[in-house]
Amino acid sequence: IKTGEVSGYNDVGQVMFKTLANTVNQKEVIKLFKKNIVKNFGPGSKYWKNLSLRKKYKKIKWKTAMKGPWIHQNILETIKNIKLKKTITGGTKVNESDGYCASLPFYFSHNSDQKTKKIIRTVANGKISEQFAMAKLKIIDLADKGDKDPVNTFLRKNIKNKYFNNVIENIKKVKKIKSKPHNFVVKKFGKACSYPGTFNGAIHAIITSKSFKTAVIKTIKAGGCNCSRANF
């Protein structure tokens, strides 16, 4: 298997990471992030050059992997909205992980929920995308601080938090079938990139794995949009 290339999801996160690393005035992060999104994914980029091939692949039954990178719907909409000079530029047609990936390096360097939500909405302007992204960040934060069972700790801390109602219900659904094989669980909740399926599949991998490596291998084997799940 050829390795060395990251997914479009991870690339969004890397664009934010590089933006943060090269920004002196933190008030300009969103402005510069938008500029870098267009530079990395827009006209002239390897993603943009693959647009016609992407359109073809959406119409046919896949037999082999598409050569080159795949630009996400959220990013296509974001680039369009940036050019239209919209205040909130994120995509609205899908509920996927772009917002989470963009916010991951930002959240851990700023630790501000309000500012993080603005970052999420910069590339994924939807309530579902925001809520699940914030939940993932909170769970990772718990693990980063040494919590041995971050998923259950998050559940306990937010059981009465209305903002996370949808997230809590989905974690409970996953826990009910924790003993089932991972491939079965991913197929049941959905292999596609969208929430809540991508979140549920990742949660199952986390709570049934003993290490990061085994969780990622399990995630890859389950197929579908394993990149969005593995980035969590």
Segments the model singles out, each with a brief description of its role:
Residues I1-F232:
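Structured, active/binding-site neighborhoods that engage oxygen-rich ligands
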